[in-house]
């Protein structure tokens, strides 16, 4: 099964990396809820300071007009969602936003461009942007789509730290969500990213009418990447009018928390990011996610083109929960 053997480079699997079959991951999902969260908390505390939360800001630097048909995405040119197309922004505008993000406590600045994949001329400008943002002392992450040969090396040379390229969903569910690319296309780009020496940010979306077994398949696919991703964003579907998944069945909040917990247990050393969908989550649900091992959030009122909790609200929630922004000093217990 594809989800069970997903090496993204030629490195021999490290003996300390546990192999996760879909059945084994599914069994984790079926663990009694509080027991599962408790186990995830124990794993989390072995590798991270449970009070430290990595704050990241995500900015859309090229918006809309994407030729892909991802059923969840309001930036697809195939759907009428009201998103206004915007060409690649100027360096100065992006740097100004990055400075604001840093002043507000973000340690990581993520940039997203709605392309199937960048062209060589796009990479020239993107590398200029990365250099400028990196000079501010921020960690940098980019999500620009499928990469051609040599592009990952160019991004690395410019100073990019992480490349985000999500698997989105389980291999078995992939064709139900996306028809313009294959699951293997994602793995190919991830391989190029690893070969270039970049860190990998790779996660998925839940709540897209997948079954629990397919959620287990997504987590197994991520956990069996070799090496495991340094950063794993777990997104809850944001239903946008005009997209095919606008009427997707609502996912129970406990199932989302289970997904966070299972991600933490199977990928103990990865950052598990509580990503899209937080604006629809209660404070109590977010608190359970942090208890279950989430230790990173996107900080700012927008995630590309969808809403995110306001920064003041996040600061208040973190204060209520006695959480603090991650720094080099408080990273570990």
From Swiss-Prot:
Chain residues that bind [2Fe-2S] cluster: 110, 141, 201, 273
Q: Write down the EC number.
A: 2.8.1.6
Q: Which Pfam families match?
A: BATS (PF06968), Radical_SAM (PF04055)
Every copy of the Radical SAM core domain together lies at 51-278
The prosthetic group or cofactor this protein requires is: [4Fe-4S] cluster; [2Fe-2S] cluster
Please write the reaction equations for the catalytic activity of this protein: (4R,5S)-dethiobiotin + (sulfur carrier)-SH + 2 reduced [2Fe-2S]-[ferredoxin] + 2 S-adenosyl-L-methionine = (sulfur carrier)-H + biotin + 2 5'-deoxyadenosine + 2 L-methionine + 2 oxidized [2Fe-2S]-[ferredoxin]
Give the note describing cofactor binding and stoichiometry: Binds 1 [4Fe-4S] cluster. The cluster is coordinated with 3 cysteines and an exchangeable S-adenosyl-L-methionine.
Q: Tell me the pathway.
A: Cofactor biosynthesis; biotin biosynthesis; biotin from 7,8-diaminononanoate: step 2/2
GO molecular function, one example?
biotin synthase activity
- Has keyword 4Fe-4S? yes
Q: Name the enzyme's class.
A: transferase
Cite the CDD domains for this sequence.
Radical_SAM
Where does this protein hold [4Fe-4S] cluster? 66, 70, 73
- Supply the SMART domains for this chain: BATS, Elp3
Which GO annotations describe the biological process of this protein? biotin biosynthetic process
Q: Provide the function of this protein.
A: Catalyzes the conversion of dethiobiotin (DTB) to biotin by the insertion of a sulfur atom into dethiobiotin via a radical-based mechanism.
Q: Which family is it part of?
A: Belongs to the radical SAM superfamily. Biotin synthase family.
Q: How does it assemble?
A: Homodimer.
Full protein name: Biotin synthase
What would be the name of the gene that encodes this protein? bioB
């Amino acid at each position: 099964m594809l989800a069970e053997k997903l090496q993204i480079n030629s490195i021999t699997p490290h003996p300390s990396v546990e192999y996760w079959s879909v059945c084994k991951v599914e069994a984790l999902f079926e663990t009694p809820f509080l027991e599962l969260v408790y186990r995830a908390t124990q794993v989390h505390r072995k590798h991270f300071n449970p009070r430290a939360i990595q704050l990241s800001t995500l900015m859309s630097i090229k918006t809309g007009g994407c030729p892909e048909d991802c059923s969840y995405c309001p930036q697809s040119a195939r759907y009428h969602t009201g998103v206004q197309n915007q060409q690649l922004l100027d360096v100065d505008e992006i740097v100004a936003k990055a400075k604001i993000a840093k002043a507000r406590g973000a340690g990581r600045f993520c940039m997203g461009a709605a392309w199937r994949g960048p062209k060589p001329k796009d990479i020239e400008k993107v590398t200029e942007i990365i250099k400028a943002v990196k000079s501010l002392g921020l960690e940098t992450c980019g999500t620009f789509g499928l990469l051609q040969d040599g592009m990952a090396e160019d991004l690395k040379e410019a100073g990019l730290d992480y490349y985000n390229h999500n698997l989105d969903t389980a291999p078995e569910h992939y064709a139900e969500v996306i028809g313009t690319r294959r699951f293997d296309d994602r793995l190919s780009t991830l391989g190029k990213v690893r070969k270039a020496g970049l860190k990998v940010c790779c996660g998925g979306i839940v709540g897209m009418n997948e079954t629990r077994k397919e959620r287990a398949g997504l987590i197994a696919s991520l956990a069996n990447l070799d090496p495991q991703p340094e950063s794993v964003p777990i997104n809850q579907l944001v239903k946008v009018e005009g997209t095919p998944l606008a009427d997707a069945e609502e996912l129970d909040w406990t199932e989302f928390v289970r997904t966070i917990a299972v991600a933490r247990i199977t990928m103990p050393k990865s950052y598990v990011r509580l990503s899209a969908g937080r604006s629809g989550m209660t404070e109590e649900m977010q608190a359970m996610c942090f208890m279950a091992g989430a230790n990173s959030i996107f900080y700012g009122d927008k995630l590309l083109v969808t809403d995110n909790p306001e920064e003041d609200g996040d600061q208040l929630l973190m204060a209520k929960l006695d959480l603090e922004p991650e720094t080099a000093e408080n990273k570990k217990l």
